[in-house]
Structure formats: structure tokens, C-alpha cells
């Protein structure tokens, strides 16, 4: 087992990994408003044997989520919280991510002309609701302030209920259970965090759990056309096996494999925290190379794709995540961290950072602001998206100073 005191200290390299992935996510998510984006930056189309930068970011973020799990749970135990209380906290966080994911994903269908508000107003109200319910309010200095914060939460709930009941998509459909990215994070976090509660930092249990997710992915992902084009376990539809995976929200195992990989690396990092920097760098990069080689081997049998969570994609992205964390940890140990200040809010107020773009998009929709055409094509379009990502982080920083920060 690891020295539990390691988990009481914040790991800056995890914050950096989370910040880099969120910054990149904001950057690539803004591509919808520009044109002529290089293919290697974009999402691959379904069935394409390719992963662009946009395809790599989300799995890397899931890996970072996994790295945070041991620290978050061990800190709760160190503060005296019980396993039951910690499980309740995990369920609460999962519920928050599912709710936020549903509101964001439903809005991506846009709105029916009969809706009582345009999409921009929907996004404004959504942000107000999220902040009202999940803001990290300062400790109340008086009973009046405590009641005020409670009122803000109630207002937030009422705003979200109003949106849910009045939402209509362009086909007239009502608010649906579409979880989106945040929901996927929520379900994956739930699975891996519950496993950690039962296993703690005992790798003899966590490594088989990761191996099980990998095995599910290997057996359940369709092979290349040259090998038949079907999964090794090609059961008929509505079978018990797939039904159980669906109930547990494991899917084909790819998403929890990313997160459980992060959990394992986090434990190894804590366990060998006292080793020399050179030792950690060599071993971390060696593991990354081995994962890369396994990815190359599996690529012979499966295409590499984010959509469908293919085995080569799992191994490639895990290799990237391990290598990136190893390098970041090395930079931290050598105090090369000044650059991190530029994107720090994306690592310490990550959920707020993810919400801020919708406020900007809402403002653009309501006001009718349109970017000049020369700023939406090719290289200048990429500069546009890069500047937007930095502006989002700057706004998040200001919001933190004003005590506005989402905390679930």
C-alpha cells in the first residue's frame, strides 16, 4: 500500500494534466464556428481508421479524472468520513454530472421555434441554474448570508426545472435523457470510484479490474473487415451480457479503461514518490512506449477510432496520457511550472471552464454578433479558437476571484 500521507498533498502534475486537456478541449470544441481546419486536428468520421487531436482530448481527460480519484477518496477518509458517506458523495457528484450533461446535450439539438426562448437565452439560464445549485459558496458569516446562499440554490433548481419543462427540440420533442460528455464522465467516474472504495490502493485488485475493461473492449469491438468485421463475442441483440454492461454503463469497456488506467498510475506515482526523478522518468516513458507497442499490435486487427472505443485507441491514448503525466511530473520536480499559470484555472476550476463557452455562445446568439469572415478560415480560424480558449480561462479566473466556481 502507498503512504497515505502522500494523498494529503496536492499533486500539481495532475492539475497540469487536467488543465492541458480542458484547455485543448475548449480549443477543439470551438472548431464548429471556423472553416478549413486541418484534418489531423478534427474528429474522425465514423468508421475512419484515424484519431485527430479532437478525438484524443476526451479520453485523456477521463484518464486525468482517474488520477484524481485516489486523492479525493483518501482525503475524505483522512478527514474522518466513512465509506458510506464517501459513496453518497460519489453518487451526488455523478448525479450532478448527469444533470449538467443532459442540459448541455439537449441544447445541442437546438430549439423549436415554438420554444418560449431562443437558444442563447437557454444557455444563459442554464449557466445561472448550474451556478445557483453547484457554486462553491464561501462559508457564511451570518445566518442571513446562509439563508441567501440557500435561496440562490433554490432559484437555481427552479430555473433548471423551468428549462426542462419548457424545452422543445426542432422536432417538437421534450427534454430527453441524453447525457453527453459530462454524463459519460459521470458514469465512468461512478464505476471506477466505487471499485476504488472496495479495493483502496491495492493494485492486486485494481490491475485485474483494468484488465477486465480491456478484455471487454477486445472481445466486444468489431474487428477489421479483413477479419470478418464482427466482434469476437458477436452475441445476438438483447443478450444478457450486453444488457449487464449497459446497466453498469461500462459499454465496450473503453471509457472505464481510460479512467482506471489513471487510477493505477496515480497509485504508482504515490507509491514511488520517493524515487529519483530519473528513475520515474525512465519507467514512466518505458510504460508509455510499451502501451504504444501494444497499440500498434492491436491496430493490425482493429481500426483506431474514438467512436466505438477501439482497442488501439485505448492503448494509444493511455500511452499518451502516461507519457504526458510523466513529463509534467518531471517538470514539477524541477520547478519548471511558470507556464502553468496561463492555464491554471482550467485545472483548478475545470467544470467552470467547461461552462463558460456556453455563456459566450449565448451572448453571440442573443446579440447577433458575427465574427469577420477572415477570422474564421484556415490559420486565422485556428488563432480565433486559440484566443477563445485563453479568453475562457481568463473569464474563469475572474469568476474564481468573485467566488463563482462550480464544485460538485
Where on the chain are the PLM-derived regions?
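Alpha-helical transmembrane segments and their immediate juxtamembrane cytosolic regions
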Residues: 1-408
Amino acid at each position: 500500500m502507498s503512504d497515505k500521507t502522500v494523498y494529503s498533498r496536492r499533486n500539481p502534475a495532475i492539475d497540469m494534466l487536467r488543465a492541458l486537456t480542458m484547455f485543448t478541449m475548449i480549443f477543439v470544441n470551438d472548431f464548429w464556428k471556423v472553416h478549413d481546419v486541418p484534418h489531423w486536428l478534427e474528429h474522425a468520421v465514423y468508421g475512419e481508421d484515424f484519431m485527430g487531436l479532437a478525438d484524443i482530448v476526451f479520453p485523456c481527460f477521463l484518464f486525468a479524472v482517474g488520477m484524481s480519484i485516489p486523492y479525493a477518496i483518501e482525503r475524505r477518509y483522512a478527514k474522518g468520513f466513512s465509506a458510506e458517506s464517501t459513496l453518497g458523495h460519489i453518487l451526488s457528484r455523478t448525479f450532478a454530472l448527469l444533470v449538467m450533461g443532459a442540459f448541455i446535450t439537449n441544447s445541442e439539438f437546438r430549439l423549436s421555434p415554438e420554444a418560449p426562448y431562443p437558444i442563447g437565452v437557454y444557455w444563459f439560464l442554464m449557466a445561472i441554474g448550474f451556478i445557483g445549485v453547484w457554486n462553491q459558496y464561501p462559508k457564511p458569516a451570518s445566518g442571513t448570508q446562509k439563508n441567501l446562499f440557500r435561496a440562490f440554490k433554490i432559484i437555481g433548481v427552479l430555473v433548471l426545472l423551468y428549462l426542462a419543462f419548457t424545452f422543445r427540440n426542432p422536432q417538437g420533442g421534450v427534454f430527453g435523457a441524453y447525457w453527453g460528455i459530462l454524463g459519460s464522465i459521470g458514469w465512468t467516474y461512478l464505476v471506477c470510484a466505487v471499485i476504488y472504495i472496495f479495493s483502496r490502493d491495492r493494485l492486486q485488485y485494481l490491475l485485474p479490474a483494468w484488465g477486465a475493461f480491456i478484455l471487454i473492449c477486445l472481445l466486444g469491438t468489431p474487428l477489421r473487415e479483413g477479419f470478418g468485421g464482427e466482434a469476437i463475442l458477436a452475441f445476438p441483440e438483447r443478450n444478457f451480457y450486453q444488457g449487464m454492461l449497459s446497466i453498469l454503463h461500462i459499454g465496450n469497456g473503453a471509457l472505464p479503461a481510460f479512467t482506471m488506467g489513471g487510477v493505477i498510475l496515480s497509485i504508482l506515482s504515490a507509491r514511488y514518490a520517493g524515487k529519483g526523478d530519473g528513475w520515474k522518468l525512465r519507467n514512466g516513458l518505458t510504460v508509455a512506449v510499451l502501451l504504444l507497442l501494444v497499440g500498434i499490435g492491436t491496430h493490425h486487427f482493429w481500426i483506431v477510432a474514438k467512436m466505438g472505443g477501439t482497442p488501439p485507441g485505448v492503448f494509444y491514448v493511455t500511452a499518451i496520457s502516461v507519457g504526458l503525466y510523466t513529463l509534467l511530473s518531471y517538470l514539477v520536480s524541477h520547478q519548471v511550472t511558470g507556464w502553468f499559470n496561463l492555464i491554471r484555472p482550467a485545472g483548478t476550476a475545470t467544470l467552470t471552464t467547461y461552462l463558460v463557452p456556453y455563456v459566450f455562445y449565448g451572448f453571440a446568439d442573443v446579440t447577433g454578433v458575427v465574427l469577420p469572415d477572415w477570422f474564421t478560415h484556415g490559420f486565422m480560424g485556428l488563432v480565433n479558437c486559440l484566443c477563445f480558449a485563453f479568453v475562457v480561462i481568463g473569464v474563469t479566473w475572474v469568476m474564481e476571484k468573485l467566488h463563482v466556481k462550480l464544485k460538485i
